[in-house]
């Protein structure tokens, strides 16, 4: 995400969730510089029990603020099992370098290869989006062109639902089968 407020709210929400459910966890906040751009990171390490946490039987959730096209570099040494994305519902997508805003399909064409590189082989990207601003067939084609394997059979084929007047949400899961 590029909105620092959204990153902080998501990190706070997840921290509150972990506390409410009494899950052992640790928050590490840091920043990395990628292509001369600072990328603030909030990383939660958590487990279901103190014993599992002590034995390093943990899961990690990383929230990062910045250009999504840098995620391949960000996760180069520790690729992810899962990338989760709720695409914007129709706003301008201006790059941080001050250049002209990219069209949404052009933005995705640029960043999807980085998402695939950020995933372990067998890892998946789970993407929700507004079908009124981005057609499902367009997103499927962009994902396929970026080297993803599309999961289109049940139970992955019927997530489409009405949210409100300007939002009709759908959901796609795509796997990285490449090493």
PLM segments and residue spans:
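Class I S-adenosyl-L-methionine-dependent methyltransferase catalytic core
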Residues: 1-179
């Amino acid at each position: 995400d590029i909105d620092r407020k959204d990153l902080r709210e998501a990190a706070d929400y997840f921290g509150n969730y972990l506390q409410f459910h009494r899950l052992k966890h640790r928050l590490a906040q840091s920043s990395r510089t990628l292509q001369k751009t600072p990328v603030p990171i909030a990383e939660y390490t958590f487990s279901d029990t103190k014993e599992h946490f002590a034995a390093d039987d943990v899961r990690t959730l990383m929230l990062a603020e910045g250009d999504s096209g840098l995620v391949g570099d960000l996760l180069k040494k520790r690729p992810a099992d899962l990338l989760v994305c709720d695409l914007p519902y129709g706003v301008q997508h201006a790059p941080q370098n001050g250049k002209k805003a990219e069209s949404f399909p052009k933005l995705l064409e640029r960043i999807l290869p980085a998402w695939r590189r950020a995933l372990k082989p067998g890892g998946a990207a789970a993407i929700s989006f507004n079908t009124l601003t981005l057609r499902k067939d367009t997103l499927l084609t962009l994902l396929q062109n970026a080297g993803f394997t599309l999961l289109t059979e049940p139970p992955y084929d019927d997530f489409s639902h009405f949210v409100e007047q300007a939002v009709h949400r759908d959901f796609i899961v795509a796997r990285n089968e490449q090493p």
